[in-house]
């Protein structure tokens, strides 16, 4: 098989892992409001569950708040209940036609705990990338069509590809760590 096929398989699987990492990072509060922290909030609306961003507009205001304006004002209390159920440690104020979600300033201790959690997620993804590398490496070794020199070249490219994906994980970690530790 051609290297391109192995690379595409590796890239596709590694991209899924990086997307998962990004979604986990978005769930971690940094002290600055980010509407992505609410992406996974499911609201009971119209007899079905809907994602919050599908039924409301969200906007960061005053540097420490997110204002949630539902398209249908009758959903205010359902949205409030869904946010409270997520147990995100946020204060929610219900106004006449919107919700104000207030982000408390994190303490040094909570910032360090968040960085530790982010580091654990990053390490988990690196292990998963190594496992992807291992799977692809076995497929390369089992490929009877490859000559010895091609096998060595493929292995070198596989190692390079693994380093590139690990560098992406490291970059994502460094950015999130900086965001968390910035007061």
Curated annotation (Swiss-Prot):
Keyword Protein biosynthesis in annotation: yes
Tell me the superkingdom of the source.
Answer: Bacteria
Q: Does the keyword RNA-binding apply?
A: no
Q: Which SUPFAM superfamilies match?
A: Ribosome recycling factor, RRF (SSF55194)
Write out the entry's keywords from A to Z: Cytoplasm, Protein biosynthesis
Main subcellular localisation: cytoplasm
Which Gene Ontology biological process is one annotated for this entry?
A: translational termination
InterPro entries referenced in this protein's UniProt entry, alphabetically: Ribosome_recyc_fac, Ribosome_recyc_fac_dom, RRF_sf
The UniProt entry's GO CC annotations, sorted and at most eight, read: cytoplasm
A Pfam family hit: RRF
PANTHER family (UniProt xref)? MITOCHONDRIAL RIBOSOME RECYCLING FACTOR PSEUDO 1, RIBOSOME RECYCLING FACTOR
For this protein, the record's NCBIfam families field holds:
frr (TIGR00496)
Q: What does this protein do?
A: Responsible for the release of ribosomes from messenger RNA at the termination of protein biosynthesis. May increase the efficiency of translation by recycling ribosomes from one round of translation to another.
Family of this protein? Belongs to the RRF family.
User: Would you tell me the protein name for this molecule?
Assistant: Ribosome-recycling factor
The organism's lineage is: Bacteria, Bacillati, Mycoplasmatota, Mycoplasmoidales, Mycoplasmoidaceae
Encoding gene, per UniProt annotation: frr
